[in-house]
């Protein structure tokens, strides 16, 4: 069975009906909406771009918002799944808490020889030992039980309220779970750059893509 929970604060009723219609004819799929605003009252969300909104932070708190769940896949809404997502759910994390795809865009920024600001930000400001192993936060598989044992809501709140983060939830996940993450197959988070480079991206893309990520100037959330 597939239990899909949409975390939101302003989806209109008409769009909710459209989303719910996606499960028509499927008896093993449930789609529900979780209104998050009431649970976020004490947080002050720092956003470094108009492209981002407070929804960007929700993934950090989902294990606490869903106390009866032990494990889950958390993904952005600007993704298209092109295979059975259950294959990712049963990915063996071993002793790790989280699984995600290595952020190859970040690696490019880290290797910028003319501007060392990104490398300095990750190693000195965030204190991440090896930023080249950072994973992209757009799609992750998370062991909720292990996560809650390691990370308190107060610790998450401290980072949300007091740090000026560039990639917000992704940065916090990588800070708190460094050494406890598994890098999974790149096909689970294949980014499509919707600008001039799109033809090159398609030409170089893996023949089998499981998940497409549409990165654009304006996120749909």
Model-flagged regions — what are they?
Residues 33-39, 57-112, 141-142, 148:
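GT-A fold catalytic core of metal-dependent nucleotide-sugar glycosyltransferases
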Residues 2-10, 100-102:
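Short internal beta-strands
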Residues 130-131, 136-221:
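A glycosyltransferase accessory/donor-loop signature
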């Amino acid at each position: 069975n597939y239990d899909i929970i949409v975390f939101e604060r302003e989806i209109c009723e008409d769009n909710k009906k459209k989303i719910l219609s996606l499960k028509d004819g499927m008896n093993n799929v449930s789609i529900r909406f979780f209104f998050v605003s009431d649970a976020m009252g004490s947080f002050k969300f720092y956003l470094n771009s108009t492209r981002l909104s407070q929804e960007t932070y929700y993934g950090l708190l989902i294990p606490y918002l869903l106390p009866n769940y032990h494990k889950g896949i958390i993904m952005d809404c600007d993704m298209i799944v092109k295979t059975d997502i259950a294959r990712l759910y049963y990915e063996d994390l071993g002793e790790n808490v989280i699984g995600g795809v290595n952020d190859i865009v970040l690696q490019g920024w880290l290797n910028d020889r003319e501007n060392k600001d990104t490398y300095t930000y990750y190693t000195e400001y965030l204190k991440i030992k090896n930023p080249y192993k950072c994973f992209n936060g757009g799609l992750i598989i998370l062991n909720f039980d292990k996560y809650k044992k390691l990370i308190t809501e107060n610790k998450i709140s401290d980072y949300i309220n007091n740090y000026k983060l560039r990639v917000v939830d992704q940065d916090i996940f990588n800070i708190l779970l460094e050494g406890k993450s598994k890098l999974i197959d790149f096909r689970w988070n294949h980014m499509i750059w919707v600008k001039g480079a799109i033809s090159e991206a398609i030409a170089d893309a893996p023949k089998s893509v499981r998940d497409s990520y549409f990165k654009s100037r304006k996120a749909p959330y």
